[in-house]
């Protein structure tokens, strides 16, 4: 079981102000946690590789695919994109001016 000086040191390191009643409560709780870690230390871990995760993580992303602007569907695709633009201007997207100059 942790004594009060150890609990006070832990509280100081954690920048906590605790009352004497809390000291005895935390001493009991922290001792239980440390006892649990002692139990974990008894597990047979020989041959177990150290790891940071239980399973491997990897990014799952869709594969890139090239869209051809040439060919039969080029005009249809281009027009569909322009039809969804807020302010199309001919075959271009009209966007707000971000640099200085006269307003168009």
Swiss-Prot record:
Residues 85-104 are annotated as: Disordered. Its EC number is 6.3.5.-. Gene3D superfamilies: Glu-tRNAGln amidotransferase C subunit, N-terminal domain. Keywords: ATP-binding, Ligase, Nucleotide-binding, Protein biosynthesis. Disulfide bonds: none annotated. Pfam families: GatC (PF02686). It catalyses: L-glutamyl-tRNA(Gln) + L-glutamine + ATP + H2O = L-glutaminyl-tRNA(Gln) + L-glutamate + ADP + phosphate + H(+); L-aspartyl-tRNA(Asn) + L-glutamine + ATP + H2O = L-asparaginyl-tRNA(Asn) + L-glutamate + ADP + phosphate + 2 H(+). One of its GO terms (molecular function) is asparaginyl-tRNA synthase (glutamine-hydrolyzing) activity. InterPro entries: Asp/Glu-ADT_sf_sub_c, GatC. The keyword Acyltransferase does not apply. It is an enzyme of class 6 (ligase). GO terms for biological process: glutaminyl-tRNAGln biosynthesis via transamidation; regulation of translational fidelity; translation. Heterotrimer of A, B and C subunits. Allows the formation of correctly charged Asn-tRNA(Asn) or Gln-tRNA(Gln) through the transamidation of misacylated Asp-tRNA(Asn) or Glu-tRNA(Gln) in organisms which lack either or both of asparaginyl-tRNA or glutaminyl-tRNA synthetases. The reaction takes place in the presence of glutamine and ATP through an activated phospho-Asp-tRNA(Asn) or phospho-Glu-tRNA(Gln). Belongs to the GatC family. This is Glutamyl-tRNA(Gln) amidotransferase subunit C. It comes from Synechocystis sp. (strain ATCC 27184 / PCC 6803 / Kazusa).
């Amino acid at each position: 079981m942790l004594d009060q000086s150890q609990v006070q040191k832990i509280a100081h390191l954690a920048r906590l102000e605790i009352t004497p009643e809390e000291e005895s409560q935390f001493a009991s709780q922290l001792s239980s946690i440390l006892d649990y870690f002692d139990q974990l230390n008894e597990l047979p871990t020989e041959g177990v590789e150290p790891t940071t995760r239980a399973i491997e993580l990897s990014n799952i992303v869709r594969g890139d695919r090239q869209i051809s602007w040439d060919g039969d569907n080029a005009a249809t695709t281009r027009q569909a994109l322009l039809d969804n633009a807020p302010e199309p201007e001919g075959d271009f997207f009209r966007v707000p001016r971000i640099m200085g100059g006269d307003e168009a």
